[in-house]
From Swiss-Prot:
Protein name stated in the entry: Ribosomal RNA large subunit methyltransferase F
Cellular compartments annotated: Cytoplasm
SUPFAM superfamilies reported for this sequence: S-adenosyl-L-methionine-dependent methyltransferases
PANTHER family (alphabetical): RNA N6-ADENOSINE-METHYLTRANSFERASE METTL16, SAM-DEPENDENT METHYLTRANSFERASE
Catalytic reaction list: adenosine(1618) in 23S rRNA + S-adenosyl-L-methionine = N(6)-methyladenosine(1618) in 23S rRNA + S-adenosyl-L-homocysteine + H(+)
GO terms of molecular function: 23S rRNA (adenine(1618)-N(6))-methyltransferase activity
Species of the source: Pseudomonas syringae pv. tomato (strain ATCC BAA-871 / DC3000)
InterPro entries named among the record's database cross-references: METTL16/RlmF, rRNA_lsu_MeTfrase_F, SAM-dependent_MTases_sf
EC code(s) of this entry: 2.1.1.181
Pfam families: Methyltransf_10
Amino acid sequence: MTDTPKPPRKKPQRPAKPAAPREKATLHPRNRHQGHYDFPKLIKSSPELAAFVILNPYGKESIDFANPQAVRVFNRALLKAFYGIAHWDIPADYLCPPIPGRADYLHFLADVLAEDHEGVIPRGASVKALDIGTGANCIYPLLGHSDYGWQFVGSDIDSTAVAAATAIVKANGLHKAISVRLQGNRKQILLGLCDSNERFDVSLCNPPFHASLDEAQRGSQRKWRALGKADPKRKLPVLNFGGQSQELWCEGGEIGFVTQLIQESARLPGLVVWFSTLVSKASNLPPIQSALKKAGALEVKVVEMGQGQKQSRFVAWTFLDKAQRTPG
C-alpha cells in the first residue's frame, strides 16, 4: 500500500490590495455639474464664452483649460447659469478655481452638519459659515449661499483679494449674506479674526499646499504640461490657473498650515461647531490626525471626494460633544 503524496505546502498569502475603483469617481449627488457641460445653454447665458469653446480630441465641446482667460470666462458662465451670480471677476494672476470640486466640498460639509440635525441639512440664514482664505474669487460663500442660503464670513491676509471679493459681493447684492474681512496678522489664521461673541456652525479652508515658491512653480508646470501636451512648443505660464504666492505656498506647506489651524482652533474651541480643511494628499493625513489628537478634538471625520480621475478629501473636527452640537 503506497502512501498518498501530500499536497505541496501553500505559501502564506499576502494581504490583498484594495481593488482599484472600476469607474471614475463621481460628484456628490447634489452637485449641479453632473455629466457633460451644456455649452449651447452656457453660451446663450454668457455669449462671451463662444470665443473660447473648442472641440477636444474626443470631438466634444470644451474649453482650453491651459488658457487662463478661457477658464475665467468659463467660470463666469457657470456661476451665472447655475448659481445666479451675474457679476464675477477677479484680478489678473489670482486663483481661478474649478467650480465643481469647490461645490462638492460644500455638499459633503452639509452632510456633516445634517448628522447633528436628524439627517436634515440645515438651511437658511441661521447657519453661519467661516471661509478661511476666501481669496479674490469668493467662491465658497457664493456657492454656499446659493445652494443652502447660509450666511458667510470670508477672511484673507491679502487686502487686494479682500477688496476683489467684497466687490463681487456688492455687485450681486449679497452684502447682507456675505461679508469679507482682512486677517491683519499674516502669521495668524483664526486668532484675532473674530469677535469674542461670534459663533459659526462650520468653517472651511483650501490651504496653500506647497512649502516654497519653487515647489509651487514645479507643481504648476507639471499641471500645465499635462494640459498642454498636445502642443509641446507652447510657452507655458508659471503658475497654474493663476494664484498669488500666499494662495499656493506657505512655510511648512500644507501640513504646517493645517497644524497651525488645528492648534488655533483648540484655543477657540467654541468658535466653530465643525472646523474643516481640504487635504491635498492622503499621505498628509497621519500627521494631521496626530495633531488633532494632541489638540483634544472630540470627533474627527475624514471625508473622501472624487471628481473624475482626481481624488480629494477634507478633514472635519469638533471640540463639542453631541449634546452641545444638537440644536434645542
